Curated annotation (Swiss-Prot):
Organism lineage string: Bacteria, Bacillati, Cyanobacteriota, Cyanophyceae, Synechococcales
Name of the protein described by the UniProt record: Gamma-glutamyl phosphate reductase
PROSITE patterns assigned: PROA
Catalysed reactions listed for this entry: L-glutamate 5-semialdehyde + phosphate + NADP(+) = L-glutamyl 5-phosphate + NADPH + H(+)
Gene Ontology terms for molecular function: glutamate-5-semialdehyde dehydrogenase activity; NADP binding
Pathway as given in its UniProt record: Amino-acid biosynthesis; L-proline biosynthesis; L-glutamate 5-semialdehyde from L-glutamate: step 2/2
Length: 455
């Protein structure tokens, strides 16, 4: 589908932007995708999924090229081991990404949903309906499969997106985008320019200056990376700067369960932002729990750091410093602190947590409820691994990122987090003057049942 990309007015900073043509194309595409029928968007998603599988060999070969170059960067100290781990894309990860695309396909269309239908008066009907945000800029590090998740969510929500992956995953991102574009070309109704790949840091800098043309920036990566993005743009930013998660083992915890949850929350994928960095243990259960947990964690290769009370029980732990409590390791390193009460655990989380995901292990229902109610985080869990904090596991199909801000969206941002709403008012020549003054006509304000929008 060809598009008209004229823009009648531009922000002053955008006039000379090297990205201007690309962003104008994206905005034109967004106007089209905003009103695409669900059937067309779902056909585009299925075409994407099919093309990704058909291009698997080329995608994995490109990823292998990235991995070989990244291995040299790790040796030279230019890339962390955790970043290298996130970069790897094998057949199973690709299959999981494709499954995520198809799950998004099966989810209800979030666009055109009626959140409110209210008859203000006879013939004067107010509706609040969902609508795409417009043009997204998504910048991510290391994980090339994130590109697939983001593209799927953008297609389903009718948004355009400009994607920039880390330089260490350039070949992988190019191969993935080539496959996705090949799939979308099979759907003639789907506009060109809605999904675009950026490949340089200069383009990112230019993107961050396009206030008024780009509606939302979503960074995914290290805390320093996310902070850089937040500090260098006036475009709204959705994301989290840290993933500093805690698991608290209460005095009433099932010890075996607590050990299993500790292992899963830390070692299942230590580079993930929802892996725990600090283990808090109640003093009453510490003598029984810590020896078992330490043994199990060491068998998984975890480096352990403990506070003084912890080292009284396990003397050979590395002493934990003040910096450890505020460090996101994203690696097989875990700090352990013994606390005297639930209050102390909550206070520690309040001071050092990043409002991402926090969990308690306990059989005490009252303690669990206090933790769930009082801990301020996007996700608060009871007797469950912090690793469940994920859009796919929540049934959102995929996530574009995790937001730790107080205002919505919060937590894993899926389809609902990528739409806004607008008020639509239909009347029959109604005048405000008729509803003011001594003889003012009264409003009826009758709510109707919600209905779905585009089909």
């Amino acid at each position: 589908m060809s598009l008209v990309t004229d823009s009648p007015s531009l922000p002053e900073a955008a006039a000379d932007s090297p990205l201007l043509a690309q962003v104008q194309l994206a905005r034109a595409a967004a106007r089209c995708t905003a009103t695409l029928p669900t059937a067309i968007k779902n056909a585009a998603l299925e075409a994407m999924a099919t093309a990704l599988l058909e291009h698997q060999e080329a995608i994995l070969a490109a990823n292998q090229a990235d991995l070989e170059q990244a291995a040299e960067q790790v040796k030279a100290g230019e890339l962390s081991a955790s970043a290298y781990a996130r970069l790897k894309l094998d057949a199973q990860k690709l299959a999981d990404a494709v499954a995520g695309v198809r799950q998004v396909l099966r989810l209800p269309d979030p666009v055109g949903q009626a959140l409110l239908i209210r008859e203000l008066d006879e013939g004067l009907v107010l509706e609040r309906r969902t609508y795409p945000l417009g043009v997204l800029g998504v910048i991510f590090e290391s994980r090339p499969d994130a590109l697939v998740q983001i593209a799927a969510l953008a297609v389903k929500t009718g948004n355009s997106v400009l994607l920039k992956g880390g330089s260490e995953g350039l070949c992988s991102c190019q191969a993935l985008m080539a496959a996705i574009q090949a799939g979308l070309q099979q759907i003639p109704e789907f506009p060109q320019g809605s999904l675009q790949l950026l490949t340089s840091r200069a383009e990112v800098k230019a993107l961050l200056q396009l206030e008024g043309l780009v509606d939302l920036i979503i960074p995914r990566g290290s805390s320093s990376f996310v902070r850089y993005i937040m500090e260098n743009t006036r475009i709204p930013v959705l994301g989290h700067a840290d993933g500093l998660c805690h698991l608290y083992v209460d005095r009433a915890a099932d010890v075996d369960m607590a050990v299993r949850l500790t292992l899963d929350s830390k070692t299942q994928y230590p580079a993930a932002c929802n892996a725990i960095e600090t283990l808090l243990v109640h003093a009453e259960i510490a003598p029984r729990f810590l020896p078992l947990a330490v043994q199990a964690l060491r068998e998984k290769g975890v480096e352990l750091r403990g506070d003084p009370r912890c080292r009284q029980l396990v003397p050979d732990l590395i002493p934990a410093t003040e910096d450890d409590w505020s460090t996101e390791y994203a690696d097989l390193i875990l700090s352990i602190k013994v606390v005297g009460s639930l209050d102390e655990a909550i206070a520690h989380i309040e001071r050092y947590g990043s409002r991402h995901t926090e969990a308690i292990v306990t059989e005490d229902a009252a303690a669990a409820q206090r933790f769930l109610d009082e801990v301020d985080a996007a996700g608060v869990f009871h007797n469950a691994s912090t690793r469940f904090a994920d859009g796919f596991r929540y049934g959102l199909g995929a996530e574009v990122g995790i937001s730790t801000q107080k205002l919505p969206p919060r937590g894993p941002v899926g389809l609902e987090g990528l739409v806004t709403y607008r008020y639509q008012l239909r009347g029959r020549g109604h005048l405000v003057a008729d509803y003011t003054g001594p003889q003012a006509r009264p409003f009826q304000h009758r709510d109707r049942l919600n209905t779905t929008g585009l089909s």
